[in-house]
Amino acid sequence: MSGMFYGTNIPNLDLSSFNTQNVTDMSRMFEDTEYTVKLYLNNFDTRNVQDFTEMFSLSRRYAIDSLTNIYVKNDFNISSVSKQIFNVFKGRRTLRGGNGSKCSFSGYNNEALKCLRIDRPGEAGYFTQI
């Protein structure tokens, strides 16, 4: 699924019916989705995903950033990640978790993977629970 929705600008992208149980690469899946405001990834099964590099990133410095919410049922399972992951949320300025949190991390290492979770008190994440 690498780059599958690259540059797509559907305001509300609902992928809750996608079967992702055998996917191993979600890198750049939503890169440069400048006008997408909400992503619905309710049933994403990420237990086999090894690469989340630039999954939600904006590659251009002055890109329009409209993404505010990513909706999920569960945290992403990152147990299969087997390499260094970069820039998962690079350039995202408007994205917030369900409790309003903004993750703080360098973005240049696996620290960004910690934000692939539901935003909870004491645990910042970029996801909003459905």
Positions of the model-derived regions?
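Negatively charged
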Residues: 2-130
